[in-house]
Every structure is written in structure tokens, then in C-alpha cells.
């Protein structure tokens, strides 16, 4: 059958610009916008209404101030919580226009600025595909078996508790910026230090509620949806460019870098398992202590039957972190950053050389500080699956002193195939991401044609990887 999708949108904008006494520069902007989208088969229309104001002022192109304020409305929240204000403020100082730098032959431009904002957003207010009425409780009914044959009883139970105080997710940002140009743009630099915090992500099964408020069968819960989890990103980024003409060749070398730490707030039963203060892309698993060498060593070690099967010599030995003489999920710890939200430090280097109608361009990228886990079918050879070359270094009685891979078995080998530091490797790498040579045909060839220009180029991508784990990464 057919479906209907209707979107109505409105936007209006008012701008103001003026200069007073040649030194006071003022501009302002007022924006109103809204939209409503309705789809067949969906009860609730997707609506948004926003009003924003921005005012900018600078004195003699030296001192800058910018203030913004957005008023937003969201139908995803309960009445009384659907409106919010999102302010922002930026302050800047252009040092180049001060008397002590105005006539400098070294500094072309130099500016420092600081900015901060608190943004209320509802984009992430969702539980699965459900975005509306998350603040309401849900009750439902079902049938179950009665106490006597041939009958069933109807019962009513809660699926979710009520929370009419559910609020917007807040994005708090603070940044300090520095920009400069030196020696007639021979060197340019743009650097920033930033702190970004996302506060109030939704959770529906918080660990600080008693477990009896949530049951597995029937799937009942009195727990409401709460604003609870917080994510924080702290770091710096920079971009430096060097531009020089050497004879007939125009050279440009650029270097960019980003370093950041991402952290989460979350509670767990064991304190060392708390995600609070740990990386958002953290790898969690077991600490290994080598391979078991004998039955006597297994008997003298904490019980590892949690993973199933029988532990034998050649299996991975794990560390009993909480000291309860057994290995289970409560012995998992933070092992390192996975780099899924970006490596702790990323680097980019680009080189451009222009000579007559030829242009040479090369781009190199690097990422450092993250870890990976060797957990695909090449490394985790289970049961009678096809073996890879890595198992040549497996544990046997003859190779126990040099083995780098656990024993082989056609039975349950789950003990060995758990996320642990035994399988981890550094993903540090520098890659020659792109090389391109371009030739621009002379413009004189197109003076009497409809063509404005024509270029031909040859390029290559991912031509080289420099890494201690190059074979794994490739």
C-alpha cells in the first residue's frame, strides 16, 4: 500500500548591522523557525519550534563579544518541561591591532578567544525507536496459567515507571582558541583546547534501584526512564601550515593533530568496574597471567569453570581481581581505549607542491594510543573450524616454553576465547593515505570553446602503512 509523508516548515530571519563613530561595530540577528512532519502509521507528529537571537560587537576590530540565545520547544517531554533556553558567549582579542604589534614585521595576525555554551537538545531523547511519552508509565495486561486445569488468568503489570521530570540532554562546551599568521603567511597556526560535556543521557535500568523493581519473567518493571549518564571529552587540536616559494615551485606543508580523552559516568557493583572516569570507547575484559603449564597449577589457581568446559594445561590463566577464588564477570577490568570515538592522538601531514601546470599532493595520517583485540575467526579458532597459520605456535607439551597460542581442542574452548589482554595489540600506525599528481591543461587551449579548463590526474590511496602490527591492521 501507499504511505503519506507531509512536512511543513517555516523560517524567518531579521538582520541588523551598523557602525558608530567608526569604531563601534554592532550586528544582530533574530531567527524563528519551526517544522512539523506527519507520517502515515505514526500517531505522534514530529514537531519542532525554535527562536534564536544573536548579537555581535567589536571595538575597532580589537575586542570582540558575541552572545547567542536560543529558545526551544520539544513535545517529547512532559508539560512544564518542554521549553528551555540555550545560551552561548564568545569573547575575543585581536592582538595584531594593538599598538605593540600593529607595525610588527613578523606578526601578520594574532587573536585569542574563549567561548562557552549550554545547548539543550532532544535529538538523543530516545529509547530504541521510541521518542515520545518516555515520561509516562506503561501498564499492560496478559494471560497466564491458573491453578486448576484448563483455565488461564488475566493479570496486569507495569512495564515502566513514571518520570514527569525527564528533561533535555545538555551539551556544555568550553573552548580556548589561538590563531596567528607570521612572516607574511609563511607560517599559520590555529590551536584550540576544548572541554565538551554531554549530561543527562537516558537510562531505564539504573543500578541504584533495588533489583525487585525489575523482573525477567514476566518482563515487568517499575523503573522510570531517567537523565543519568554523562559523557565528557577533553582535548586539544591544532593545524599548522608552512608556505614557501622555492624558485618556480610553490610549497605548502600542513600538520594537523587532535588529542582527546573521552570519559563516562556510570555505576557498577564492583568499584573497579565503574565506567565513571573511564574512556567511552573502553575495552573491558580479563587480565591474563600466561598459559597453564600443568594440572597442579590449575588446581592451585582460582576456579575458571565459569566459561564452561574443562580447563587444561595450555589454556589461558586469568587474574582473580576481586579475590573470591573464582573467575567470572566480576573480574573484568578496563584494559585500554578501543579508539572507536577516535584515537587518543591523531595526526595528519599534507604536502602540496605546484610547478607550472603540475601539482603534487600527498597526505599522511596517523593514529596513536588505542588498542585492538584479535577476536575474529583468524585468531579465535574454535572446535573443528578451519585453522589459520597463527596456531602453529600453539601450546603443546613440547612447545610449552615458547608457545604464544593456547592449546587446540575440538571441544569447548570458550575459556580461551574471552576478551582479555592476551589478545590485545596496539593500533598505532602511520599511513600514506593519498598521493596525487595533477596536470592542468593550458587555458589558452579553451579560449574559443565552451570549456573553462581541463585537468588530468593520477592518484593512489593507502599506499603504505607503518606499524608494528601492520599485518593485523591490513
What is each of the regions a protein language model found here?
Residues 1, 42-50, 82-88, 129-138, ...:
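Flexible, surface-exposed loop regions and adjacent strand-edge segments
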Residues 1-11, 25-27, 37-39, 44-46, ...:
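Surface-exposed, low-complexity loop segments enriched in small/polar and acidic residues
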Residues 8-35, 46-99, 171-174, 182-189, ...:
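Surface-exposed extracellular loop regions of Gram-negative outer-membrane beta-barrel proteins
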Residues 19-26, 62, 96-110, 127, ...:
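Short loop/turn motifs that connect adjacent beta-strands in outer-membrane beta-barrel proteins
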Residues 102-171, 188-231:
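Solvent-exposed loop/turn elements at secondary-structure boundaries
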Residues 128, 229, 243-341, 468:
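Conserved small-residue
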Residues 282, 313, 367-455, 459-460:
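Extracytoplasmic gating/loop element in the C-terminal half of outer-membrane beta-barrel translocons
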Amino acid at each position: 500500500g501507499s504511505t503519506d509523508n507531509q512536512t511543513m516548515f517555516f523560517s524567518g530571519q531579521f538582520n541588523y548591522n551598523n557602525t558608530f563613530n567608526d569604531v563601534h561595530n554592532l550586528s544582530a540577528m533574530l531567527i524563528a523557525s519551526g517544522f512539523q512532519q506527519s507520517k502515515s502509521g505514526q500517531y505522534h507528529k514530529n514537531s519542532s519550534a525554535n527562536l534564536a537571537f544573536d548579537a555581535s560587537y567589536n571595538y575597532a576590530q580589537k575586542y570582540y563579544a558575541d552572545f547567542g540565545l536560543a529558545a526551544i520547544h520539544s513535545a517529547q517531554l512532559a508539560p512544564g518541561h518542554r521549553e528551555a533556553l540555550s545560551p552561548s558567549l564568545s569573547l575575543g582579542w585581536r592582538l595584531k591591532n594593538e599598538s605593540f604589534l600593529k607595525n610588527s614585521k613578523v606578526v601578520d595576525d594574532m587573536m585569542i578567544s574563549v567561548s562557552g555554551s549550554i545547548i539543550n537538545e532532544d535529538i538523543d531523547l530516545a529509547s530504541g525507536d521510541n521518542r515520545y511519552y518516555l515520561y509516562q508509565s506503561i501498564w499492560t495486561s496478559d494471560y497466564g496459567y491458573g491453578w486448576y486445569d484448563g483455565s488461564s488468568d488475566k493479570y496486569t503489570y507495569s512495564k515502566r515507571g513514571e518520570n514527569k521530570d525527564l528533561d533535555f540532554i545538555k551539551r556544555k562546551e568550553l573552548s580556548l582558541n589561538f590563531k596567528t599568521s607570521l612572516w607574511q603567511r609563511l607560517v599559520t597556526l590555529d590551536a584550540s583546547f576544548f572541554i565538551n560535556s554531554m549530561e543527562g543521557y537516558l537510562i531505564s535500568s539504573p543500578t541504584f534501584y533495588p533489583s525487585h523493581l525489575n523482573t525477567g519473567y514476566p518482563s515487568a518493571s517499575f523503573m522510570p526512564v531517567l537523565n543519568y549518564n554523562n559523557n565528557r571529552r577533553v582535548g586539544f587540536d591544532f593545524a599548522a601550515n608552512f608556505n614557501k616559494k622555492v624558485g618556480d615551485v610553490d610549497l605548502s606543508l600542513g600538520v594537523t593533530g587532535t588529542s582527546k580523552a573521552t570519559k563516562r559516568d556510570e555505576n557498577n557493583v564492583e568499584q573497579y568496574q565503574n565506567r565513571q572516569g573511564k574512556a567511552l570507547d573502553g575495552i573491558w575484559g580479563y587480565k591474563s597471567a600466561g598459559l597453564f603449564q600443568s594440572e597442579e597449577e590449575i588446581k592451585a589457581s582460582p576456579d575458571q569453570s565459569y566459561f564452561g568446559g574443562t580447563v587444561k594445561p595450555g589454556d589461558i590463566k586469568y587474574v582473580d581481581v576481586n579475590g573470591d577464588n573464582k573467575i567470572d564477570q566480576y573480574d573484568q577490568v578496563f584494559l585500554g581505549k578501543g579508539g572507536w570515538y577516535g584515537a587518543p592522538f591523531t595526526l595528519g601531514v599534507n604536502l602540496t607542491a605546484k610547478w607550472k601546470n603540475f601539482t603534487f599532493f600527498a597526505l599522511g595520517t596517523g593514529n596513536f594510543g588505542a588498542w585492538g583485540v584479535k577476536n575474529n575467526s583468524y585468531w579465535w579458532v574454535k572446535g573443528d573450524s578451519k585453522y589459520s597459520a597463527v596456531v602453529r605456535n600453539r601450546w603443546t607439551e613440547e612447545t610449552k616454553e615458547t608457545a604464544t597460542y593456547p592449546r587446540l581442542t575440538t571441544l569447548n574452548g570458550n575459556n580461551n576465547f574471552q576478551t582479555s589482554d592476551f589478545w590485545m595489540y596496539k593500533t598505532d600506525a602511520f599511513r600514506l593515505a593519498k598521493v596525487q599528481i595533477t596536470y592542468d591543461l593550458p587555458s589558452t587551449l579553451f579560449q574559443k570553446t565552451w570549456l573553462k579548463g581541463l585537468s588530468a590526474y593520477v592518484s593512489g590511496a593507502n599506499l603504505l602503512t607503518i606499524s608494528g602490527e601492520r599485518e593485523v591492521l591490513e
